[in-house]
């Protein structure tokens, strides 16, 4: 990205670069670092020594391809081999062997790993950087209390605080604190050394009492005092080696290991020059920190902003994988120790290969990718989603924050985020501000800091030489950084005027001559999602946030279409997502079909397999369509085949459709959307979805389960699609309830159900007669479609732990329907409320009916005016057959630049098409349109245009659900919750109030008793419904009331209830 040859030029970096660089750093540095830490292992008698020679490690190329790993549910990994030596000290003999340590999952070209056939991605985490931080808080008297917090590499904290008598304490736990002199003495310093190494010895001497002198008289006394306070132990503990080890393990290892980043930060903050390889906290650090704290008390020095990015570090893929390798090697060390002692005990001669097993490394990485919170299943809804997922930054995870504990200041946008973390793109809900997204040009530096690029402007001539710099958050505070207008092309005017700039987290207006650096790109401070929104500068940030989230939920359509109005980043996103097939070198196409493209180049013939109807983990359809013809010559980097949601190598998530902003009979009230039937019959918003259904065969105690077509007691109609093996045939159309895989599970029948001849066989020959239970895979509700693939995965060693898995893939074609969610790129979302015949839709002056009607009231209050600009410019583009790519913040060139562009294009479209209604000067951008039902014009002119509208993955087919009867919760006896459990609809507190307000007593009673948790009453309802007659009233209490009584009894409170007769007011007491 840094172009040194051509000064002042830069290109957009690869969007997966962060992941690739992290993995490369792990393979190149992290692997060797961890292997070099592996200790020499000796037996108890010190006769045998085992060691690894990490200089000769080797990673072997995987035997399987990525696609096969996904198909067979395997891990795409590389085998790690290291040379190991076993030395017999008595004879000085050494046996050296190349040993297999385990498998390390590899990263593929998408920046993801394939583990057990599933694409997984590791998220970057933001943590508080290890080092020291000074802060002040007000106590209950309103006096400032200064504290210095030392944060270790593991996240452990040691707090130094100064009281009003200028005494310095180290807080070792929430309740206990000890004098700084005791801590320094316990760490190995005597009083003379302490006083020689501090700037204010008189302050240290001032709180040195006789009692304190006794505590620090010797190192042993100091350690005992420290141990007593730290462990809250009463009495007089005795100094011993085990006591020192316990302190070392519980305190010094957790709270005093700084790591290389922590050592660098402390050296910089306290002005020390301790060597970088000293990664533990030293007495000198403690004393320098105390000096600095005293200076703070007297008004010298500055406090630290904990939320500034210079005080944060990024824990990347490299760090996480390296930590796991260290963990695996520690487990391997224990295994080797155990094996050596076992071999000596049994008088066996060990070899390096016998001592080492590959299980610790392989299982550690499998559990890391499967269970670690920062390892997530790659979201593959569309190409944008795949790329954005790998660029997330999370404050959550081990050592980080939680959604419940994080305060508002941490979630808020900080000035240091500028050009590093996107101020717009974050999740909604409890994790808002805790999960961010990397800005386009940001990169992770060597010390775990986020760096952003700037152009350096030289003093003498602001034009002649321009150089590009990458600055960390701690460096860019010292520069005047121009923003906004400084990017204008008209440099002549610019030099005469003042420009907005950023300096030390403040925004100033300064003369152009004073500028040191300037931004390199209009998109520099945004993430990819936000950079795809045209006219984003005219939108409220909340709506831009929703839009960048909703673009990730867009479903790839069966016929994709490029946006007329875009930002120019669409091509880069599509290329980096790996969805289109791209030529790796030039050549000539020899053959092409839907399955593969064959071309010759460099004297070789290459065959590129295409993805055909592959399921993503969000059930969307991934498919590649060839874009080249036979005999055509191609160049390196040319698009060979388009993928899902790409057209000509550009991202294409939605459709440009004709939209009017107007109310229509209340059908678009409150974000509802009215659409034309053309969108359904023209397959404009039709998408394909592939669902996976699987079943496993186990070996039970009664014998193995069988896959068969011969299923007793089932109608032949349900088995019509099965082949002779009992598995559904490819290409068959299946409906709800059909059998996909026939399976019988052996089951021993009860004694009473045996036939007499079975009993005779059992008595004479001892043969156990088994009957089979039908456990077939049936198609659930809403699953109807076409079977497009069947996979029978048989894992090696087909034991009961490795069952055979049969997977059936069914494709569904879904047109747009009432209840589906659609959205624009400006946070304007809505649910389809009605599908109108095309003749009833409002139509334009040239007779074209509108495709979609939005509510105009959704624009002013939400302040997302960008959609109006996009809408009008899209209309002009469709009439002129042009596509526009507009960078954000075009107002830096001139005022009202967006509006001028839109109106000039509309005027040109009006002239070229000879349609004066396209641009009418009285109400520019609006037009008179007609009611399709009556043919009369509407009273007011209406904004019409062609915005880019997406269909989202929230579809009514996945949400709609009904329940007549089903399962009940065991404790409350109320229906379960959720669609997956066939649950019921909750009637909550507010729903009860609504029914009470209408006075519908009987409906309310039904909902709270028969339909819910009154066990006897609901059984009676079933009987009376079948026989006919009136439903009897429930007489006793429902189960939830009985549950309340039981819970009160557990608190020793007895609650009795009575039934009062309506006729004679007789009180009838009943036991609950």
UniProtKB/Swiss-Prot annotation:
It catalyses: RNA(n) + a ribonucleoside 5'-triphosphate = RNA(n+1) + diphosphate. Signal peptide: none annotated. The keyword Plastid applies. The keyword Coiled coil does not apply. Keywords: Chloroplast, DNA-directed RNA polymerase, Nucleotidyltransferase, Plastid, Transcription, Transferase. InterPro entries: DNA-dir_RNA_pol_bsu_ext_1_sf (IPR042107), DNA-dir_RNA_pol_su2 (IPR015712), DNA-dir_RNAP_su2_dom (IPR007120), DNA-dir_RNAP_su2_hyb_sf (IPR037033), RNA_pol_bsu_bac (IPR010243), RNA_pol_bsu_CS (IPR007121), RNA_pol_Rpb2_2 (IPR007642), RNA_pol_Rpb2_2_sf (IPR037034). GO terms for molecular function: DNA binding; DNA-directed RNA polymerase activity; ribonucleoside binding. CDD domains: RNA_pol_B_RPB2. It is found in: Plastid, Chloroplast. Its EC number is 2.7.7.6. GO terms for biological process: DNA-templated transcription. GO terms for cellular component: chloroplast; DNA-directed RNA polymerase complex; mitochondrion. In plastids the minimal PEP RNA polymerase catalytic core is composed of four subunits: alpha, beta, beta', and beta''. When a (nuclear-encoded) sigma factor is associated with the core the holoenzyme is formed, which can initiate transcription. DNA-dependent RNA polymerase catalyzes the transcription of DNA into RNA using the four ribonucleoside triphosphates as substrates. Belongs to the RNA polymerase beta chain family. NCBIfam families: PRK00405.1. This is DNA-directed RNA polymerase subunit beta.
């Amino acid at each position: 990205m840094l172009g040194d040859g051509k000064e002042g030029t830069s290109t957009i970096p690869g969007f997966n670069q962060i992941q690739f660089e992290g993995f490369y750093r792990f393979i190149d540095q992290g692997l060797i670092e961890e292997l070099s830490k592996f200790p020499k292992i000796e037996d108890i008698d010190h006769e045998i020594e085992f060691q690894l020679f990490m200089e000769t490690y080797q990673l072997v190329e995987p035997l399987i391809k990525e696609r096969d790993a996904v198909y067979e549910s395997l891990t795409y990994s590389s085998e790690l081999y290291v040379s190991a030596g076993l030395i017999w000290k008595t004879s000085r003999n050494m046996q050296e062997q190349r040993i297999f340590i385990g498998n390390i999952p590899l990263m593929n070209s998408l920046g993801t790993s394939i583990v057990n056939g599933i694409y997984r991605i590791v998220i970057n985490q933001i943590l508080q950087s290890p080092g020291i931080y000074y802060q002040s808080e007000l106590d209950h008297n309103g006096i400032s209390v200064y504290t210095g917090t030392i944060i270790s590499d593991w996240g452990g904290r040691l707090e130094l605080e100064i009281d009003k008598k200028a005494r310095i304490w180290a807080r070792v736990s929430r309740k206990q604190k000890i004098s700084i002199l005791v801590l320094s003495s316990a760490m190995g310093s005597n009083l003379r050394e302490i006083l020689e190494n501090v700037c204010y010895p008189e302050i240290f001497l001032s709180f040195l009492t006789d009692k304190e002198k006794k505590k620090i008289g010797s190192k042993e006394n100091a350690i005992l005092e420290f141990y007593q306070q730290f462990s809250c132990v009463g009495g007089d503990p005795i100094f011993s080696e085990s006591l020192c080890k316990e302190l070392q393990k519980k305190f010094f290892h957790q709270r005093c290991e700084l790591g290389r980043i922590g050592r660098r930060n402390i050296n910089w903050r306290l002005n020390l020059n301790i060597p970088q390889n000293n990664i533990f906290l030293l007495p000198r650090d403690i004393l320098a920190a105390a000096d600095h704290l005293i200076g703070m008390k007297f008004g010298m020095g500055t406090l630290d902003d904990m939320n500034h990015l210079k005080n944060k570090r990024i824990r990347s893929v490299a760090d996480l994988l390296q930590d796991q390798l260290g963990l695996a090697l520690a487990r391997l060390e224990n295994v080797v120790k155990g094996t050596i002692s076992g071999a000596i005990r049994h008088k066996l001669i060990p070899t390096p290969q016998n001592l080492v097993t590959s299980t610790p490394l392989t299982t550690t990485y499998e559990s890391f990718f499967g269970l670690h919170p920062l390892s997530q299943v790659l979201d593959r809804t569309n190409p944008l989603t795949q790329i954005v997922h790998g660029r997330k930054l999370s404050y959550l995870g081990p050592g980080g924050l939680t959604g419940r504990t994080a305060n508002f200041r941490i979630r808020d946008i900080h000035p240091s985020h500028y050009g590093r973390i996107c101020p717009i793109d974050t999740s909604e809900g409890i994790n808002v501000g805790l999960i961010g997204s990397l800005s386009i040009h940001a990169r992770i530096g060597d010390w775990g800091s986020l760096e952003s690029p700037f152009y350096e402007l030289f003093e003498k001539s602001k034009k002649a030489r321009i150089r590009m710099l990458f600055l960390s958050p701690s460096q860019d505070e010292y520069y005047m950084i121009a923003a906004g207008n400084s990017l204008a092309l008209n440099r002549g005017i610019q030099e005469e005027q003042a420009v907005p700039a950023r300096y030390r987290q403040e925004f100033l207006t300064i003369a152009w001559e004073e500028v040191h650096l300037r931004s390199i790109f209009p998109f520099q401070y945004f993430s990819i999602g936000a950079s795809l929104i045209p006219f984003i500068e005219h939108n409220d940030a909340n709506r831009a946030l929703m839009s960048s989230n909703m673009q990730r939920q867009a479903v790839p359509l069966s016929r994709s279409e490029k946006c007329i109005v875009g930002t120019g980043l669409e091509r880069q996103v599509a290329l980096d997502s790996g969805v289109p097939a791209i030529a790796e070198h030039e050549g000539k196409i020899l053959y092409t079909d839907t399955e593969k493209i064959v071309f010759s180049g460099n004297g070789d013939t290459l065959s590129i397999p295409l993805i055909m109807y592959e399921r993503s983990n969000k059930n969307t359809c991934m498919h590649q369509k060839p874009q080249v013809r036979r005999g055509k010559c191609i160049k390196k980097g040319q698009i060979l085949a388009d993928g899902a949601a790409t057209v000509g190598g550009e991202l294409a998530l939605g459709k440009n459709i004709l939209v009017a902003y107007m109310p229509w009979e209340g059908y678009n009230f409150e974000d509802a959307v009215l659409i034309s039937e053309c969108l359904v019959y023209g397959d404009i918003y039709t998408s394909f979805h592939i669902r996976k259904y699987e079943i496993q065969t186990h070996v039970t105690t009664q014998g193995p389960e069988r896959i068969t077509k011969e299923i007793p007691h089932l109608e032949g109609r349900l088995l019509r699609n099965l082949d002779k093996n009992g598995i559904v045939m490819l290409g068959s159309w299946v409906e709800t309830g059909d059998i996909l895989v026939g399976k019988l599970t052996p089951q021993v029948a009860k004694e009473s159900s045996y036939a007499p001849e079975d009993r005779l066989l059992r008595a004479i020959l001892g043969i156990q007669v088994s009957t089979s239970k039908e456990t077939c895979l049936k198609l659930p509700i809403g699953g109807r479609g076409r079977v497009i693939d069947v996979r029978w995965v048989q894992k090696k060693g087909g034991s009961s732990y490795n069952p055979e898995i049969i997977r059936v893939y069914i494709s569904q074609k879904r047109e747009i329907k009432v209840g589906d969610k659609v959205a624009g790129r400006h946070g304007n979302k809505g649910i389809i409320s009605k599908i109108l015949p095309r003749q009833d839709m409002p139509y334009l002056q040239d007779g074209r009916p509108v495709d979609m009607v939005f509510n105009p009231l959704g624009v002013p209050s939400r302040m997302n005016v960008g959609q109006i600009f996009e809408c009008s410019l899209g209309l002009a583009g469709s009439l002129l057959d042009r596509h526009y790519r507009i960078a954000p913040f075009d107002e830096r060139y001139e005022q009202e630049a967006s509006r001028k562009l839109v109106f000039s294009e509309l005027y040109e479209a009006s002239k070229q098409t000879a349609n004066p209604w396209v641009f009418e000067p009285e109400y520019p951008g609006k037009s008179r349109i007609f009611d399709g039902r009556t043919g009369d014009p509407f009273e007011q002119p209406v904004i019409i245009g062609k915005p880019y509208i997406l269909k989202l993955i929230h579809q009514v087919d996945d949400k709609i659900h009904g329940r007549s009867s089903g399962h009940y919760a065991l404790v409350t006896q109320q229906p379960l919750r959720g669609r997956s459990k066939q649950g019921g609809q909750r009637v909550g507190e507010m729903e009860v109030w609504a029914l009470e307000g209408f006075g519908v007593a009987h409906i309310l009673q039904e909902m709270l008793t028969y339909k819910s948790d009154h066990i006897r009453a609901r059984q009676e309802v079933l009987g009376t419904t079948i026989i006919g007659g009136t439903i009897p009233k429930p007489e006793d209490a429902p189960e939830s009331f009985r549950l309340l009584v039981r819970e009160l009894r557990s608190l020793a409170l007895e609650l009795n209830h009575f039934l009062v007769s309506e006729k004679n007011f007789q009180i009838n007491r009943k036991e609950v």
